[in-house]
């Protein structure tokens, strides 16, 4: 009898951060470049990590997974609820920092396990981030 596949699903009601991991700053010390996160990126990582920690699965994923993420940005009144957001930030930049935070929180052993990824961003009356993780 096969083991039941793990699945995790949750919604984090929040205004999603728009700062992304791509926004590294560089300082030069003793002739060597030092990369660091500017304060807004550091704050975004802390916000995501604090919210994600509440939804950590009972055990880490250790096999291939599908990650479905829906980023719901606050509607500015110019868009319909659920309309696709086709402006910055880019989905790949959002996802990189998000997966790094999920790794830090212990969702999986390594984000290389994410073999299938669906990421969408919308304008929404109720902002937040919807997440679903499925074992493949």
Tell me the role of every PLM-derived stretch.
Residues 2-136:
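Acidic, proline/glycine-enriched N-terminal capping motif
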